[in-house]
């Protein structure tokens, strides 16, 4: 699609309230003056984009303009002006499908069948037009309106690629970890079947409220997916019909050539004979699990969006977490003992999109998903919110070029060295904070902690504490610079980097001191601290401590 150049957007459209905001863009409601029709206009600040980014915008616009289906968010116009690019989409007001489900009074297998049918129809339309979405997940499944029975709309073609027929090729390691197919993880040629695998994951979640593949460790998560290691555990799956499980099995078939297609799946009895095959029983347990699943996704998204929008877009730092070809950042701090208890809790959350080097087929990534290996010519590039269909929530990044290029080893080594140095920096600032506590130096402590510091700690009896006043009391009444010597050891500190300007550290804290009778004592506590770098300075914004009080009270 040729972009319309030098057309005055404001001559044709009137802008209204803001709907959302990203790093380099803002989304506002607009009305076409000639027709009075409402749309959503994504306004991208092109002054911050490179020539290559402009090409990618044009490619994505071309893909979106090609797709005209009632279950796909449609791009109506693409207008380029000096310094800005305007993308005019359907105004989709119903929010996410998964959020709507948990608000319903009644939800059954038959409802899940109707949902997946619409998703499959949108995917089939993509495939017929030679488009592979590559990033099917709950965040990209929206509802046209808040009316009952509103159509499901597939959104965000930021990772979409164009293919010829049933072409299988290596288009790069791209997608969202929990929804990646085995062939992508094996670095094999792939094509349209990757979307059907993701549909299988989505259908699984629609039926029980948690994902089929989950693990707090990236490598183990990927091993599960490559092995197709999922099951239908009791008791929640006991009430799911065999036909529903059969469709999931056909979608989650490891061999892509034997996987059910987007044309075949709607003909499955569980979908085309829904009224007689799919169960009508209300699935309350699914709704409850889905609430936890949604809550975890939203919390992670809110934290990452804040970090991304406020980060320093320095070209010198861009090697750490460049995202022009990557997408949403991931952190590895959320753990869970069971997907049924708290929803998905792997190190790689299902909503976290990641892209790796498209040609390094033999190397299993040893970094967390927020590390993107890119081409030499991108080394000084900054990342931005370029996904032109991500209207309803800020996101960053774009798809990898389908033409594979080798990422130089020096880039990988440099990234590893910088990450290692930053982890040591987090350990050091944590030690400084602990030292200020041991010394009873509240002034030094306050300089290292954010004024809005939040915490869970034994002294607060399970309550969330905010600010410094709670801790000031202990500094002034239980601690002093003249106290007997206290020595603290941090055992096994583990640092997880969250973008360039945030990190989380977990460790065991051993505190040695002399009690009132002169006897040596040792206390142990387990701590997790979240750090955020602001104006070049690390500040502790949250901590969680269990075990004994942090400092002995004489």
Swiss-Prot record:
Transmembrane segments: none annotated. ATP binds at residues 19-27, 42. Autophosphorylation of CAMK2 plays an important role in the regulation of the kinase activity. It catalyses: L-seryl-[protein] + ATP = O-phospho-L-seryl-[protein] + ADP + H(+); L-threonyl-[protein] + ATP = O-phospho-L-threonyl-[protein] + ADP + H(+). One of its GO terms (molecular function) is ATP binding. It is an enzyme of class 2 (transferase). Keywords: ATP-binding, Calmodulin-binding, Kinase, Nucleotide-binding, Phosphoprotein, Serine/threonine-protein kinase, Transferase. Residues 330-340 have a biased composition (Polar residues). CDD domains: STKc_CaMKII (cd14086). The active site is at 135 (proton acceptor). The modification Phosphoserine is found at residues 314, 318. Residues 13-271 form the Protein kinase domain. First detected at 18 hpf. At 24 hpf, expressed in discrete anterior locations and along either side of the midline. At 48 hpf, expression is predominantly in the forebrain, and then accumulates in the forebrain, hindbrain, and retinal epithelium at 72 hpf. GO terms for cellular component: cytoplasm; neuron projection; postsynaptic density. Residues 324-375, 392-413 are annotated as: Disordered. One of its GO terms (biological process) is regulation of protein localization to plasma membrane. Belongs to the protein kinase superfamily. CAMK Ser/Thr protein kinase family. CaMK subfamily. PANTHER family: SERINE/THREONINE-PROTEIN KINASE. CaM-kinase II (CAMK2) is a prominent kinase in the central nervous system. This is Calcium/calmodulin-dependent protein kinase type II delta 2 chain. It comes from Danio rerio. The lineage of its organism: Eukaryota, Metazoa, Chordata, Craniata, Vertebrata.
């Amino acid at each position: 699609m040729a972009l319309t150049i030098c057309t005055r957007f404001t001559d044709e459209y009137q802008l209204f309230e803001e709907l959302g905001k990203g790093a380099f863009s803002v989304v506002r409601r607009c009305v076409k003056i000639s027709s009075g029709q409402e749309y959503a206009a994504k306004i991208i600040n092109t002054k911050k984009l490179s020539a290559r980014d402009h090409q990618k915008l044009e490619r994505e616009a071309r893909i979106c303009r090609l797709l005209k289906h009632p279950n796909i968010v449609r791009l109506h116009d693409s207008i380029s002006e000096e310094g800005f690019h305007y993308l005019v989409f359907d105004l989709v007001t119903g929010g996410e499908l998964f959020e709507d489900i948990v608000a319903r009074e009644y939800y059954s297998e038959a409802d899940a069948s109707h949902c997946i049918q619409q998703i499959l129809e949108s995917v089939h339309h993509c495939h017929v037009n030679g488009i592979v979405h590559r990033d099917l997940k709950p965040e990209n499944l929206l509802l046209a309106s808040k009316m009952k029975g509103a159509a499901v709309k597939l959104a965000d073609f930021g990772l979409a690629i164009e293919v010829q027929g049933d072409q299988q090729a290596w288009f790069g390691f791209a997608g969202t970890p929990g929804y990646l197919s085995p062939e992508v993880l094996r670095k094999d040629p792939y094509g349209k079947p990757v979307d059907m695998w993701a549909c299988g994951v989505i259908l699984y979640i629609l039926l029980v409220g948690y994902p089929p593949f989950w693990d707090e460790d990236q490598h183990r998560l990927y091993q599960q997916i490559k092995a197709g290691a999922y099951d239908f555990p009791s008791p929640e799956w006991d009430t799911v019909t065999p036909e529903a499980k059969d469709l999931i099995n056909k979608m989650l078939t490891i061999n892509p050539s034997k996987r059910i297609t987007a044309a075949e799946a709607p003909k499955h009895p569980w979908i085309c004979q829904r009224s007689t095959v799919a169960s009508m029983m209300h699935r309350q347990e699914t709704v409850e699990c889905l609430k936890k699943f949604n809550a975890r996704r939203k919390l992670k998204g809110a934290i990452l969006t804040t970090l991304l929008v406020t980060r320093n877009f320095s070209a010198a730092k861009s090697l750490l977490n460049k995202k022009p070809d990557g997408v949403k950042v991931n952190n590895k701090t959320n753990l869970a003992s069971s997907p049924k208890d708290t929803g998905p809790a792997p190190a790689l959350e299902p909503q976290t999109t990641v892209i790796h080097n498209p040609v390094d087929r033999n190397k299993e990534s040893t970094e967390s998903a927020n590390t993107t290996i890119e081409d030499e010519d991108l080394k000084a590039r900054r990342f931005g919110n370029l996904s032109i269909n991500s209207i309803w929530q800020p996101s960053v990044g774009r798809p990898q070029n389908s033409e594979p290029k080798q990422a130089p080893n020096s880039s990988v080594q440099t990234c590893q060295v910088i990450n290692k140095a930053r982890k040591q920096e987090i350990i050091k600032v944590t030690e400084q904070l602990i030292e200020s506590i041991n010394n009873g130096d509240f002034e030094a402590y306050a300089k290292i902690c954010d004024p809005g510091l939040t915490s869970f700690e034994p002294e607060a009896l399970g309550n969330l504490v905010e600010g410094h006043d709670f801790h000031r009391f202990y500094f002034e009444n239980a601690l002093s610079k003249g106290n007997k010597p206290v020595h603290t050891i941090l055992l096994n500190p583990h640092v997880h980097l969250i973008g360039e300007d945030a990190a989380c550290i977990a460790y065991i804290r051993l505190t040695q001191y002399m009690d009132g009778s002169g006897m040596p004592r040792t206390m142990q506590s387990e701590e997790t601290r979240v750090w955020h770098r602001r104006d070049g300075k690390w500040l502790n914004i949250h901590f969680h401590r269990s075990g004994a009080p942090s400092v002995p009270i004489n």
